[in-house]
Amino acid sequence: MSVKLRLARMGNKKRAFYRIVAVNSAARRDGRPLEFLGFYNPMVNPAEVKIDTAKVQKWLDQGAEPTDTVRTLLKKQAG
C-alpha cells in the first residue's frame, strides 16, 4: 500500500475548500483518509493554509509521497 498526501475537496458548489489528508493511493479523491493533516481554503484573500507539520513529517518519514499541490503548500507553510 503506497500512501499519498493529497487534497480532498469539501464545501459547496463554487465555494470549495480542501482538507489535506493521508490516503491510500488507490482510494478515490474523497474516500476515507488514513489521517487528516490540515486544510487549505483558496476562497479567502489571502488563501488560508493550516498544516500540522508533526503529522506530515510522520507520514513523510514512513514513505508517503505528497502530490505536487500539497508539496507546494508545504513549501509555502515552511517558508
Curated annotation (Swiss-Prot):
In the record, biological process GO terms are: translation
Which top-level group of life is the source organism from? Bacteria
Q: Single GO cellular component annotation?
A: cytoplasm
Keywords of the record, alphabetical order, are: Ribonucleoprotein, Ribosomal protein
Q: Which InterPro entries match?
A: Ribosomal_bS16, Ribosomal_bS16_dom_sf
Entry's Gene Ontology molecular function annotations:
structural constituent of ribosome
Query: One Pfam family from the UniProt entry?
Result: Ribosomal_S16
The record's family statement is: Belongs to the bacterial ribosomal protein bS16 family.
- Which NCBIfam families does the record cross-reference, listed alphabetically? S16 (TIGR00002)
Q: What is this protein called?
A: Small ribosomal subunit protein bS16
Q: Which organism is it from?
A: Nitratidesulfovibrio vulgaris (strain DSM 19637 / Miyazaki F) (Desulfovibrio vulgaris)
Q: Which gene encodes it?
A: rpsP
